[in-house]
């Protein structure tokens, strides 16, 4: 009886560990491929513009988990900055400047695999007219 209980406990621990290991992670470096902007008026999409990010002017986001807090590094073609922190809970990504926590960008994670990340910005408050941004990334492996 004791052996079967220990075996069952070991199997449960191994199953729990393997399910955690196999889940994709947002940590790492991502290159933005496309940006899509939808203009929305009274709940209706009135215009959609989707453009690739030029390879000669790349945009990177790098998600870093440091002991002092989660940092997002951003590269806009000229310089890396690490002025932002992030949280990721229940497929909701919130990005906040380190210096001003009263301003933030909130996105829903539409897709997260080992190689792809898609985010759509959640509009703040209710408005008759707003732009909804969607970003698509691929993981950079070096």
Regions found by a protein language model. Give the residues of each.
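Sec-dependent bacterial lipoprotein signal peptides
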Residues: 1-19
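Lipid interaction determinants
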Residues: 20-83, 89-142
């Amino acid at each position: 009886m004791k052996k079967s209980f220990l075996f069952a406990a070991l199997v449960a621990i191994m199953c729990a560990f393997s399910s955690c290991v196999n889940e994709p992670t947002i940590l790492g470096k991502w290159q933005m491929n496309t940006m899509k902007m939808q203009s929305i008026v009274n709940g209706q999409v009135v215009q959609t513009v989707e453009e690739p990010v030029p390879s000669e002017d790349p945009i990177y986001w790098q998600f870093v988990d440091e002991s002092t807090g989660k940092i997002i590094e951003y590269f806009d073609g000229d310089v890396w900055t690490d002025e932002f922190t992030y949280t990721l809970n229940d497929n909701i990504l919130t990005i906040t400047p380190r210096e001003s926590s009263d301003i933030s960008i909130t996105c829903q994670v539409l897709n997260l695999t080992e190689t792809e990340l898609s985010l759509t910005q959640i509009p703040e408050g209710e408005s008759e007219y707003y732009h909804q941004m969607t970003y698509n990334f691929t993981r950079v492996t070096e």
